[in-house]
Curated annotation (Swiss-Prot):
Superkingdom of origin organism: Viruses
Protein name: Glycoprotein U23
Subcellular location: Membrane
Major subcellular location class: membrane
Entry GO terms, CC: membrane
Organism: Human herpesvirus 6A (strain Uganda-1102)
The encoding gene: U23
Residues passing through the membrane, by range: 184-204
Entry membrane topology: Single-pass membrane protein
List of glycosylated residues: N67, N80, N103
Entry keyword set: Glycoprotein, Membrane, Signal, Transmembrane, Transmembrane helix
Length: 236
């Protein structure tokens, strides 16, 4: 019964994995809000099949000042925790008059292969600088302009997205089926070994009990009173 249950679980897992491997994955879209000290909305539209990501930073004019003049973005992309790409995406300028939006397009490794992959992309806002015009008067009464710089630093990370295999063929199915059969053979061998061991223990226990009973019987037969009764019966 236990073995049949195990086979049923393995079969269900096989069907589930095959369904995952042949599922078509559309562009993954998600939005998030940056950390509070950044005070800006960040929205991202990512297509993990083509390896393109577009990020829009919507600046808060009250926090950032009149003009947002510089935003420097850094991106780190992790592929299965073994491959990392670090690149500076853009140094863009924007103005409140055009909506304080900075569009950044990034690239990361295209999803390939037969296995499900985890891709984690994080965007780090290195600096968001603002300049404001301030009228000052010198001792001579001449008006000058200064541009004090305000820098805001924050870290924003996207969610970890699990990307399923996107393929028109079943190249990975054969390899997975071989691995599945190998695991199944190992499990069957292990369960068979354990079952044989248990059966052997039961046989040895039964043999020991019978041998003990046999020894007790012969000990009982060898007692003097038993022998005398047997001799009396023989004489009669």
């Amino acid at each position: 019964m236990l073995f049949l249950s195990f086979l049923l679980v393995c079969l269900c897992e096989e069907v589930r994995m095959l369904n995952l491997m042949t599922t078509e994955v559309s562009a993954t879209e998600f939005a998030s809000i940056a950390s509070k000290n950044m005070e800006t909305d960040v929205s991202t539209s990512s297509d993990y099949l083509t390896g393109k990501s577009e990020t829009t930073f919507s600046a808060n004019s009250e926090t950032w000042g009149k003009n947002v003049t510089e935003i420097s973005i850094d991106s780190e992309t992790y592929l299965n925790q073994s491959f990392m790409v670090t690149s500076t995406l853009a140094v863009e300028t924007t103005d409140r008059s055009i909506g304080n939006n900075v569009n950044v397009t990034s690239s990361f490794p295209t999803v390939k292969g037969d296995e499900t992959q985890n891709i984690e992309t994080s965007f780090t806002v290195i600096s968001a600088s603002t300049f404001s015009d301030v009228s000052e008067k010198t001792p001579q009464g001449l008006s000058t302009k200064s541009t004090p710089k305000k820098t805001v630093q924050a870290l924003w990370e996207t969610d970890t997205v699990q990307v399923l295999e996107f393929t028109d063929t079943h190249e990975g199915d054969e390899e997975y089926f071989k691995d599945f059969l190998s695991s199944l053979v190992i499990w069957i061998g292990g369960i068979s070994f354990i079952g044989a061991f248990v059966i052997l223990i039961v046989i040895l226990c039964n043999w020991y009990k019978k041998d003990k009973q046999r020894s007790l019987f012969w000990d009982e037969e060898k007692k003097p009173d038993v022998q005398m009764r047997r001799d009396v019966k023989t004489c009669r």
